[in-house]
């Protein structure tokens, strides 16, 4: 419609003017006399990208953010100096680590909420356990390195690394205590009431014990291998696995000796280009030997007690189904036929692998008396990154990072709370663990086993009702995706609207004879990715396919390495990322030959190209064939892959070059309008708000009277509602069935209502150390819908938490006479209603032309 064209063009011109001012500060809109490609911004020198390509590798020096490398000096603006001065003022900022622990506490509150269905509560408890594992590996690991090397340097909240570790330890001890109190006192008893029973082989009936023993002898005994620990270094055990520590002493009767299969020796050499955590990683572990055999045939005097370890590994399932305990059969009533281990209405019984092995542990040690056998678990430091200045081969370097991570220091030790002092002291000494990060666990270690219970079949009444993703009314299954996008921009809200159109677009492109090229960035993908399959199929059919595969995506490195190799073999031109930066932008470009010429079809997103997590994460997709956006996307992609000087983009914001400046300019614009008596308003939704410069800019906007509403799911270092500093700032967090992952931003902009989606949170790593995109939402209907959706997040009174000035959170409840409102449920019902309305509903509203 004409209205849409007029509004779109007005938005473009405003974006173009801002881009000129952003890229060329001090120049008028027509003075482009600043050298292109040498854009200066706080934190860095001028940048050109240097990609790691699959065949040709660049060895030019580049900025590196690796652990242990001294950062380059940079010219700081007056604004930046102001922020650094403010950062020393502790009351201005919440500590990042404690803010994250507040987030995990909100997830734990979901597990503690009786209004949430039982298996969903179990799932939330499992999530808190998984979250805490990653926090310990990454954040605690990083702080321990800082405590050793950083001296007394303080973070923006005013704490040293040592002080942060002390605060984290205290908070985590309370968090873990609360997890297990909830498990013992509520969840396990409630599960038992619904006939989902966790069985301890030491306390069960003879019938269940017989079934447990059959499983142990048939499926477990032959797989596991104990390792002796007498007079030898502790074996190199994997992190996050469950292991059994066994305390032994000589028995009165010596039974037949069994020699368990020897474990493979481990090569602990560490590549010179990797940051090491301590000298302990250079120790060479000794393979386990027969527990009873003396070394080299020499006689040995056995000590009074010995220790052995049994790694349970990951081959065997941890949750072991057992027969259901059936009630006595009444006389004259025929028993019902059922599968003893199927989770039907009659129930489900299970034992944990560590309990099973502990009960029958004597079988591994004939001739020895077992004093005690207790499970333990270690967490290793995962904050090890490639020092890219010394890595000529990124793929090989990342494989070495994975190996080094496997051998890194232990940052946390979890032990069964009933372990005796000998086992406890032995483990602490063996792993050289900081005592404040030793956790005595009164219950099963590693609560992620509860995920398995959440997936039990036949327990639907204990889970949330299904909300199947809906097809967008803008997409007709009978027509090509190219036709649908040609009719106008399509915005999808996942997971309420299906991610299938994104997958379908790539699958159609792979076989369409008119498609000439496909360009794709992959950060995290699924295990059997249809998107990767489509890229390989396109390359095999002779299309020009380029994929940037970010090998440095933490904890997905191994999968991405595997995909990169497979795609190369299929003929895809693979780029391994950019030296010194992580490529985190979500963009796909398809170049298609059409009667009017070449057309670029582009997908921009806030989430990963992962069709599995797209059903669990709240994200935004925009599908467009807009010429200017397509041109910008191509220039962005060429800059990333071609080691060329980035050119100014008309509409897209790009980190680490211009995105920070653009965000600050947008906030500053609202500040200036408010000072001039106009209405200033900012609504922003993101995963984390950490950057002190952005926070300081928001404080200034608040002091000028700008209304600021922030929906921050996780870490928020800003203090809202502080008189004289942030009185007009409101921060809420939504924790519900879907993970809130979208980054969307609204600026009133004098009534123009500018909307953006982005791959970037407002964190230093996103703005300065990653390749990210900020994408304007130009289509008027999409812009209106996105703005209304953002506003809904501040009406939730069921699963919303409002942040307090001290960094704590209060759960929002309906006020008197206020109806309950749950934003995720509301969004899903809206999508269902839109789907029912259909694609060809008559226009019911009219939009007039308005002057810019």
From Swiss-Prot:
Q: What the entry says about post-translational processing?
A: An intermediate of this reaction is the autophosphorylated ppk in which a phosphate is covalently linked to a histidine residue through a N-P bond.
Q: Which cofactor does it need?
A: Mg(2+)
UniProt binding sites for ATP: 131, 617, 713, 741
Claim: Glycoprotein is one of the keywords in the record: no
List each coiled-coil range.
none
**Which of the seven top EC classes does this enzyme belong to?**
transferase
Q: Which GO terms describe its biological process?
A: polyphosphate biosynthetic process
User: Which reaction equation describes what this protein catalyses?
Assistant: [phosphate](n) + ATP = [phosphate](n+1) + ADP
List all Basic and acidic residues biased stretches.
20-36
What are the entry keywords? ATP-binding, Kinase, Magnesium, Metal-binding, Nucleotide-binding, Phosphoprotein, Transferase
Query: What this chain does, per the record?
Result: Catalyzes the reversible transfer of the terminal phosphate of ATP to form a long-chain polyphosphate (polyP).
**Family annotation (NCBIfam families):** poly_P_kin, PRK05443.2-2
Q: HAMAP family of this UniProt entry?
A: Polyphosphate_kinase
Q: What is this protein called?
A: Polyphosphate kinase
Provenance organism: Rhodopirellula baltica (strain DSM 10527 / NCIMB 13988 / SH1)
Lineage, top ranks: Bacteria, Pseudomonadati, Planctomycetota, Planctomycetia, Pirellulales
Q: Which gene encodes it?
A: ppk
């Amino acid at each position: 419609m004409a209205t849409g064209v007029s509004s779109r063009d007005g938005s473009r011109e405003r974006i173009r003017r801002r881009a000129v001012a952003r890229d060329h500060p001090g120049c008028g809109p027509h003075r482009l006399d600043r050298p292109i490609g040498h854009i200066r911004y706080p934190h860095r020198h001028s940048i050109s990208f240097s990609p790691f390509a699959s065949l040709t590798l660049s060895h030019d020096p580049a900025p590196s953010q690796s652990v242990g490398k001294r950062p380059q000096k940079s010219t700081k603006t007056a604004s930046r100096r102001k922020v650094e001065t403010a950062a020393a003022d502790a009351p201005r900022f919440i500590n990042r680590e404690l803010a994250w622990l507040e987030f995990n506490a909100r997830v734990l509150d979901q597990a503690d909420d009786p209004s949430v269905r039982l298996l969903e509560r179990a799932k939330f408890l499992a999530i808190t356990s998984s979250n805490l594992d990653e926090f310990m590996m990454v954040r605690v690991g990083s702080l321990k390195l800082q405590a050793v090397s950083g001296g007394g340097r303080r973070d923006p909240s005013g704490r040293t690394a040592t002080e942060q570790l002390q605060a984290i330890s205290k908070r985590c001890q309370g968090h873990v205590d609360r997890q297990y109190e909830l498990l013992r006192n509520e969840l396990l008893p409630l599960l038992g009431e619904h006939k989902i029973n966790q069985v301890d082989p030491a306390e069960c009936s003879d019938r269940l014990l017989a079934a447990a023993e059959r499983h142990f002898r048939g499926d477990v005994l032959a797989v596991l291998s104990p390792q002796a620990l007498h007079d030898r270094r502790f074996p190199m055990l994997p992190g996050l696995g469950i292991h059994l520590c066994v305390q032994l002493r000589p028995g009165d009767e010596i039974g037949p000796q069994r020699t368990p299969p020897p474990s493979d020796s481990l090569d602990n050499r560490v590549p010179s280009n990797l940051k090491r955590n301590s000298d302990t990683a250079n120790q060479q572990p000794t393979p386990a030997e027969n527990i009873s055999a003396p070394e080299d045939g020499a006689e040995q005097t056995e000590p009074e007690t010995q220790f052995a370890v049994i790694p349970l590994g990951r081959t065997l399932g941890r949750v072991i189904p057992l027969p259901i305990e059936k009630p006595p059969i009444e006389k004259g009533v025929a028993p019902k036929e059922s599968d003893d281990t199927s989770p039907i209405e009659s129930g489900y019984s299970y034992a944990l692998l560590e309990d099973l092995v502990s009960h029958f542990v004597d079988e591994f040690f004939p001739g020895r008396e077992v004093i005690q056998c207790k499970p333990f678990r270690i967490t290793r430091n995962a904050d090890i990154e490639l020092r890219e200045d010394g890595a000529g081969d990124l793929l090989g370097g990342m494989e070495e990072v994975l190996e080094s991570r496997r051998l890194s220091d232990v940052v946390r030790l979890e032990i069964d709370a009933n372990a005796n002092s000998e086992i406890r002291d032995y483990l602490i000494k063996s792993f050289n663990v900081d005592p404040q990060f030793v956790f005595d666990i009164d219950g099963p270690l590693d609560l992620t086993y509860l995920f398995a219970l959440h997936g039990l079949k036949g327990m639907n009444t204990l889970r949330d009702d299904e909300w199947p993703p809906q097809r967008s009314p803008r997409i007709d299954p009978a027509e090509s995706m190219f036709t649908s996008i040609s009719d106008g921009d399509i915005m999808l809200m996942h997971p309420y609207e299906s991610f299938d159109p994104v997958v379908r677009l790539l699958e159609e492109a792979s076989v369409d004879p008119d498609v000439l090229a496909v360009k794709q960035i992959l950060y995290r993908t699924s295990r059997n990715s249809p998107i990767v399959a489509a890229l390989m199929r396109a390359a095999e059919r002779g299309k020009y396919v380029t994929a940037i595969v970010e090998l440095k995506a933490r904890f997905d490195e191994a999968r991405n390495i595997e995909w990169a190799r497979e795609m190369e073999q299929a003929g895809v031109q693979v780029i391994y990322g950019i030296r010194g930066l992580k490529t985190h932008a979500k963009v796909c470009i398809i170049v298609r030959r059409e009667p009017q010429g070449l057309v670029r079809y582009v997908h921009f997103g806030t989430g990963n190209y992962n069709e599995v997590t797209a059903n669990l994460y709240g994200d935004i997709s925009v599908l467009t064939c807009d010429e200017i956006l397509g041109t910008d996307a191509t220039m962005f992609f060429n800059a990333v892959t071609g080691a060329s000087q980035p050119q100014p983009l008309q509409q897209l914001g790009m980190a680490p070059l211009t995105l920070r400046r653009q965000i600050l300019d947008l906030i500053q614009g609202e500040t200036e309008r408010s000072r001039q008596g106009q209405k200033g308003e900012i609504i922003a939704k993101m995963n984390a708000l950490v950057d002190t410069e952005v926070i300081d800019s928001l404080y200034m906007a608040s002091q000028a009277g700008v209304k600021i509403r922030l929906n921050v799911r996780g870490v928020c270092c800003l203090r809202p509602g502080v008189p004289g500093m942030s009185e007009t700032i409101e921060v809420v967090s939504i924790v519900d069935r879907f993970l809130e992952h979208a980054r969307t931003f609204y600026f009133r902009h004098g009534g123009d209502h500018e909307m953006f989606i982005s791959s970037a949170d407002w964190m230093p790593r996103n703005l300065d150390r990653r390749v990210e995109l900020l994408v304007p939402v130009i289509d008027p209907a999409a812009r209106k819908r996105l703005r209304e959706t953002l506003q809904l997040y501040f009406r939730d009174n069921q699963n919303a938490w409002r942040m307090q000035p001290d960094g704590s959170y209060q759960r929002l409840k309906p006020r008197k006479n206020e109806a309950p409102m749950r934003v995720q449920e509301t969004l899903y019902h809206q999508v269902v209603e839109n789907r029912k309305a259909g694609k060809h509903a008559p226009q019911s509203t009219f939009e007039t032309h308005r002057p810019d």
